[in-house]
Structures are given as structure tokens and as C-alpha cells.
Amino acid sequence: PAMNSLCKHLANALEIKKQTRIGEIRPADSGWDLLNDEGESLGQFDRVVVSIPAEQAAILLPREAELVGQISSVSFHPCWSVMAGFEQPLTDQWAGAFPQASTLAWIARNNTKPERNDAFEHVVLHATADWSSKKEGADPAAVAEELLQEFWRVSGMAPSAISYQNAHWWKYSTPVQKQTDGCYLNKNGTIA
């Protein structure tokens, strides 16, 4: 399944507003008023789930919400991520790997995941947080090339023809400290 499959399933019976940025969450008489970034109300809601990085959520949440204090200490590591597609299958020996002594933290063969198209070889590479921090602002094409070279090195495979590649700077990748609380809620459980 795709990463958004759960959300799509849960939203099946809901009216979804796409291409809409929430600019403010404001207390209302019966819950919360969501305003778009132009200040227009999108309606009042009993409960709100904010699923963005803590640094961004703290700006969005109302100042009187208890959550701002709770989430203000949460910080994230960055990660450069590369997706590459290959014309030929690479291997059937593994689906994922955590390389040791490498600038790569994780390698995944996405086409081996359930319900994914296995007709094409797709590899996702995640760089380590330390390496990614040092490469903030780097040229994505140069990052992709460097991480692909590292992939060939740690995998021991001979380089293969790439049909496409894309690098993405993921500013809020993983929490610096593991969060054991699950999710954060305000006192009456109306904002998570």
C-alpha cells in the first residue's frame, strides 16, 4: 500500500478540500474554527488533528493551547532522500538494508512492498542525518549522484542503467529523540 492509503481509507466518506492551506486554528464556541491562509473560515470542527512537524504545528496552533508547550521541545533530523528507477531488476536477494559505515542510513526496494508495481525496479535511498545536515542546500542532482555512487559501493552491485532519479531534501525527517507519548492532546482531547 502507498503511504497515504490509511488516510484515503479514513477519508472515504468525507468532503476533502485539496490545495487548501490552513493558516490558523482559532478557538470557537463549539470547538475550533479553521481558517485558510487568506483568513477565510473553512468551518467549525469538534476535533482537529495536526499532522505536521512540531515546529510548524507550534506556529499554527492557538497560543492558549497546551500543546504548544508540549511540542516545543520536539526537534527533527533532516534527511536527503533519493528515488531511482532502473530498467532492469537489480537483485532478488534483499528488500531493504541498513548499511554500516556509510552515508546511507536506509535502502529500500520499493517495488518489493505489498501492492506495489513490481514490473519496475524502484530504490529509495535515505542518507544519514549527519551527512544530510552537512549537505543542506546542496544541488539535488549532485546529491542524487553521490548517494547512488554510495549505493553501488555498499550493495556490491555493478552500476545499472537508471531510467529516472529524483532527490528530495526532507527537513523534518525523524525526531531527534524518540517520542514515547504517542500523540499529544490538549486537556479536553479536541486537538491532537
Please give the residue ranges for each predicted region.
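A conserved short coil-to-beta-strand element within the FAD-binding core of flavoproteins
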Residues: 18-33
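Central helical "cap/lid" subdomain
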Residues: 41-95, 157-159
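Short, well-ordered alpha-helix to beta-strand connector turns
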Residues: 13-14, 45-46, 188
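Helix-loop-beta segment of a Rossmann-like dinucleotide-binding subdomain
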Residues: 1-8, 31-33, 124-132
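Short beta-strand to alpha-helix junction loop
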Residues: 1-9, 17, 134-146
